[in-house]
Amino acid sequence: MSYFTREKHELTAATPWEKTVAKMLSPFNRFMNSANGSGILLVFLTIVALVFANTSCREWYERVLNQQLLVQMGSFKIDMTIHYWINDALMTLFFLMVGLEIKYEMKVGRLASLKRAVLPIFAALGGMIVPALIYFSFNSQGETVSGWGIPMATDIAFAIAILLLLKGKVSPSLTAVLVALAIVDDLGAVIVIAIFYTDNLAWSPLIAAFLCFAVLLLLNRGGIRALWAYIAIGSLMWVFMLFSGVHATVAGVLTALATPMNAVYSPTEFSTQARQLLDEFDAHPDSKTQVAHSRELNDLLQQLSTGIQKTQTPLQRLEHILNTPVYFLIVPLFVLFNAGVHVELNNLNALLHSPVLKGVFFGLVFGKLIGVVSAIMICVKLKIAALPADATFKQVLGIGMLAGIGFTMSIFVSELAFSGQAQHLAEAKITILAASLTAATLGYCWLRFITGAAKAETGTSVSQ
């Protein structure tokens, strides 16, 4: 049950003006709170970006992308285009969110125990290695070889959005495997970015960045749970990373890994003290009036708020703070300013014969499917791990198809792989969009229509 919602307020103390505003905002709030709202927004903005890049708006669109934005404090300055501010600065918050999800899964989620983690880890490894090899088979030499990391990633937001549309066609445990697989994929992508897509290293800023990381670890070890301290030092680490040659977004992941995941109070302690506070609140003579009329009531609420914060882990609080701005502002901005690719029909024949197109498309659509499904089958055959009892082999095939939705992370890697190579970058982006759409359509249709009657097969093993 949900508490403290706008709807409950409307039934009691809402003024006529509040009711009118609430009614106007209701569709917007429902969209923001829907599980697939972010995915719908990303699809819409992808279309908008493509329209901008292929109409008379193209000149304006590119001018905005290349607009310089200077941040200066004394002699220190960072001067980048809006495009790079989004990709190197704002996307650091996306990678911070990714890092928080990785740490959560490794601590208490599906990756917390080796027994539960084996299947998604092997599936993710298969889903990274096979697409990279397929890409390399088409691009074994020349300047396009650097794009091998593009088809390795899975866009978790889009994959989960497709599963939500299917409502019950996939077992919950297999859905959890896909989520864990995508998180391991993200971890792999971060490692690839940090190691293989790094410019010439500047050692002084890099050492300073890792000193910041060491300070964050010491804060964690010392029981410091103030989020502002981690954000401040993490921001400083981002600046050093930016000048070090390592991609600055790595600072987001490192900050996440150093964020504490232990609370001050246990649930039992919180429950006991919160009940005492609420009893005092109810017994107070001013409890029937507005809190603004009583300092004592306000003090009780402040104590309750402090208790709530100290019962939540800093990691959970930061993840909650970041969730809406990351998925409804930062990632949409990234898509809007990175998915706009100018398509020249005159060059369509050359595009279709491009080794980049072949490597990315076959890597995402077929490489992911082959890699994920083969890894799961090998694990089950060798009894390294068991297929979830409520899952079927047909569902595993569908999950393998959905893993080919690269989108956000693939576009991000393509920007690094083909920096300064406009033609190859355009080819990669067009192919990522086409391949992700193909993988999503195949996965959805397979799980919707082919596995529709497969519920009775629940419990069958992959060997069948």
Curated annotation (Swiss-Prot):
Keyword hit for RNA-binding: no
GO molecular function: sodium:proton antiporter activity
Subcellular location: Cell inner membrane
General function of this protein: Na(+)/H(+) antiporter that extrudes sodium in exchange for external protons.
Gene label: nhaA
Top-level division of the source organism's lineage: Bacteria
GO CC term (a single one): plasma membrane
Catalytic activity from the UniProt record: Na(+)(in) + 2 H(+)(out) = Na(+)(out) + 2 H(+)(in)
Membrane topology: Multi-pass membrane protein
Keywords, sorted A to Z: Antiport, Cell inner membrane, Cell membrane, Ion transport, Membrane, Sodium, Sodium transport, Transmembrane, Transmembrane helix, Transport
Annotated family: Belongs to the NhaA Na(+)/H(+) (TC 2.A.33) antiporter family.
Transmembrane segments: 37-57, 82-102, 118-138, 145-165, 176-196, 200-220, 226-246, 248-268, 321-341, 360-380, 396-416, 430-450
Keyword 4Fe-4S: no
Lineage of origin: Bacteria, Pseudomonadati, Pseudomonadota, Gammaproteobacteria, Cardiobacteriales
Cited InterPro entries: Na/H_antiporter_dom_sf, NhaA
GO process annotations (BP): regulation of pH
Protein name: Na(+)/H(+) antiporter NhaA
